[in-house]
């Protein structure tokens, strides 16, 4: 009897070790997946693709939100790739809007915009908040000494990445007094996949809990809303489904970021970016 108990215990211990090993491998895979080639588009590329008019190849002239939205995407992308974190909460700094962005790893990603931002953060002392970084990267600062942090030609650089990935093409269009480089969509399948993912997240796959949603999908919803391109993804829906998707997205985006950011397994940076846009 004693021998059987010992064998049973050894078997249980072996199963536990295998389970722990599998969990650690899974965690490692999830950490490394952000830098793998499986993730075809960055959040910035997805936001720009949603905002582009398919045939014309440019974003709406009236959209003045997408620039800051793309910078918010850079911060979330760096967070998801394990390059930055938010400082721990303290008595004086409980709100996400007050927390500084800390550089966790200065390992370059291979993406020019992300790597340029990493270099800026590495050279910045003291650290800045999420809202400050969005303003600095956009160039919306009154401090002439901080204009060096502005990321220039962001839309054009992202569009070129999408051209290299075979999703856009490059053309020249004449607008009365000037010529403009445009980037019409050539791979409509990829854009449709993106639109379908957003639609399903608020319709067929709606979970009514942001913390159960895929982090990149939640990020894209926040960024698309902040960039004023979210409605573009719902234009093909019937009136009933359109209203449902808009109501659910509104319900999601009106949650209190500080409350959501404190919940277990919350992706703090997503809520910090939403909080920053709510304050701006």
UniProtKB/Swiss-Prot annotation:
Signal peptide: none annotated. It is a peripheral membrane protein. It is found in: Golgi apparatus, Golgi stack membrane; Golgi apparatus, trans-Golgi network membrane. Pfam families: GPP34. Keywords: Golgi apparatus, Lipid-binding, Membrane. GO terms for biological process: Golgi organization; Golgi to plasma membrane protein transport; Golgi vesicle budding; positive regulation of protein secretion; retrograde vesicle-mediated transport, Golgi to endoplasmic reticulum. InterPro entries: GPP34-like (IPR008628), GPP34-like_sf (IPR038261). GO terms for molecular function: phosphatidylinositol-4-phosphate binding. A 1,2-diacyl-sn-glycero-3-phospho-(1D-myo-inositol 4-phosphate) binds at residues 62, 71, 152, 155. One of its GO terms (cellular component) is Golgi cisterna membrane. Residues 171-182 are annotated as: Beta-hairpin required for oligomerization. Residues 10-32 have a biased composition (Basic and acidic residues). Transmembrane segments: none annotated. Residues 1-32 are annotated as: Disordered. Phosphatidylinositol-4-phosphate-binding protein that may play a role in the process of vesicle budding at the Golgi and anterograde transport to the plasma membrane. Homooligomer. Belongs to the GOLPH3/VPS74 family. This is Golgi phosphoprotein 3-like A. It comes from Xenopus laevis (African clawed frog). The gene is golph3l-a.
